[in-house]
């Protein structure tokens, strides 16, 4: 009887994907597509923007596929954990951008020239994150959006 119970328990673990080693199977990474756009893209866009899809993903590894559709401008994507009050974001009027040494920056795509793409992976915990382009003038021109990470 005891042996049968052990066999049934082992079969249950196998069917649940928890054996061998009793480690649950890895969850696939979430994928977020990010389009960097501005008026030079020629799609009737009248402002700068980061277009993100989807706006919510599960916690864990997140893969960002970033594409710059601009014809003229280099853009970037920073993933930041924002402060409680956005009004307290450290902004340099002289540099016309956020002061990166004073923000909680989790990832930086570097600069994508017009037509370039880039992929980056970031491990994110549940919470709200701000995706921004911090090239001079771009953050204030609207190149920012939110990403929600759930359990």
Give residue spans per PLM region.
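Sec/Tat signal peptide C-region and signal peptidase I cleavage site
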Residues: 22-28
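Contiguous segments within soluble domain cores/interaction surfaces
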Residues: 62, 68-98
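N-terminal export leaders
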Residues: 3-7
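Extracytoplasmic
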Residues: 29, 52, 59-61, 72-74, ...
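Bacterial N-terminal signal peptides
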Residues: 9-20
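Extracellular/periplasmic metallocenter environments
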Residues: 71-72, 110-151
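Extracytoplasmic beta-sandwich strand-turn segments characteristic of Greek-key/jelly-roll folds
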Residues: 85-124
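N-terminal edge beta-strand
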Residues: 29-61
